[in-house]
Amino acid sequence: MTKLSRKLQTQKRHRRLRRYLIGDATRPRLSVYRSNNHIYAQVIDDSAQTTICSASTVDKELKEKSEKLPSDCNSSSIVGKLLAKRAIKKGIKQVIFDRGGNLYHGRVKALADAAREAGLEF
């Protein structure tokens, strides 16, 4: 029996999670994608198949403040706060958190905690 690579394990977990995580207009899905260098988060209405708002470490607003954000928990918390601010501005207070198959630890946890502190409920 062969062992799956880390990427395949993440994809397998994500497929398993997506069976149950469905966002709608009243409670959209906060989806997180984590790469080696960056973290991306977006609030998605699955019923209309639209992205309501998004934020990432490569966002123009964050690049104006600093030249390059490192791939650490501090950057993830900045992205979480920015995403929560944008979602609340569009009238969204409750979301369903989709960790994207990643373990709820480190950068993903930092983003979630920052979004909660900024006012999102999940």
Swiss-Prot record:
Gene3D superfamilies for the chain: 3.30.420.100
Biological role: This is one of the proteins that bind and probably mediate the attachment of the 5S RNA into the large ribosomal subunit, where it forms part of the central protuberance.
- Subunit description: Part of the 50S ribosomal subunit; part of the 5S rRNA/L5/L18/L25 subcomplex. Contacts the 5S and 23S rRNAs.
User: Is Ribosomal protein found in the keyword set?
Assistant: yes
Against InterPro entries, the record matches this protein to:
Ribosomal_uL18_bac-type, Ribosomal_uL18_bac/euk
List GO molecular-function terms, semicolon-separated: 5S rRNA binding; structural constituent of ribosome
NCBIfam families, per database record? L18_bact (TIGR00060)
Instruction: Give GO cellular component annotations, separated by semicolons.
Output: cytosolic large ribosomal subunit
- Protein name, UniProt field: Large ribosomal subunit protein uL18
Keywords of the record: Ribonucleoprotein, Ribosomal protein, RNA-binding, rRNA-binding
